[in-house]
A protein has these predicted regions:
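Short, solvent-exposed interaction modules
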Residues: 79
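Beta-rich carbohydrate-recognition and catalytic domains
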Residues: 1-75, 83-141, 145-199
């Protein structure tokens, strides 16, 4: 999988490949490409695990584009997790927005596509993991697991900005009853080793 100068949404970059099993040996790889304005969009490529070095198809247009001006993802989106739930597919993603005193803001979003629908729609124009008392900095890259007793999210949680270009973050855990509304208590899944800034 690589950028495609002939496709407007992915002229440069091929970021955060995120797999979705389709059945048999077919896998859809969701990934982020950048347009001429350096804004990331989410599209996909199709591969067969029996010939993983051959790309069978790549989306001609993105499945998810940056959000409306002023929203948390107005300057770019990247995939972080795709999960099937009942009769719908959920695309959990990273939203980018230029910062002010810091280089950027990063928060986690969700888009949903019901079976048979033509396109994903945002669950909300707001992040599903926004700033809160226990997470006052960046909260992004949600990776979601559905368990017999509920939903669990592993996500990137900022703990400080070392300077305007360098956030410091670890991996924390959130819980949910429906995969939509999340409870966070600052529970750390993977913490820093001495000298580390980012996980």
């Amino acid at each position: 999988i690589r950028p495609a100068p002939g496709l407007w949404w992915c002229r440069t970059h091929a970021m955060l490949p995120t797999p979705e099993r389709l059945g048999g040996s077919l896998v859809r790889i969701w990934w982020g490409g950048r347009n001429d304005a350096n804004q990331s969009h989410i599209g996909w490529s199709l591969i067969d695990l029996e010939r993983p070095d051959v790309v069978l198809e790549t989306a001609l247009d993105p499945e998810l584009a940056p959000g409306r001006l002023g929203t948390f993802d107005d300057n770019g989106v990247l995939p972080s997790c795709v999960i099937h739930s009942g009769s719908e597919t959920r695309l959990y993603y990273i939203g980018f927005k230029p910062g002010g005193t810091t280089r950027m803001d990063l928060f986690g979003g969700l888009a949903i596509k019901p079976d048979g629908a033509a396109a994903f729609e945002r669950y909300s124009e707001a992040p599903i993991i926004e700033r809160c008392k226990v997470n006052p900095f960046i909260n992004t890259a949600p990776f979601v697991v559905k368990t017999p007793v509920g939903w669990r999210m592993y996500y990137v949680a900022g703990v400080e900005w070392v300077h305007r270009d360098l956030p410091r973050y670890n991996i924390q855990i959130a819980s949910s009853k429906d995969g939509l509304n999340w409870q966070r208590k600052g529970r750390v899944a993977i913490d820093f080793e001495p000298g580390e800034n980012a996980l």
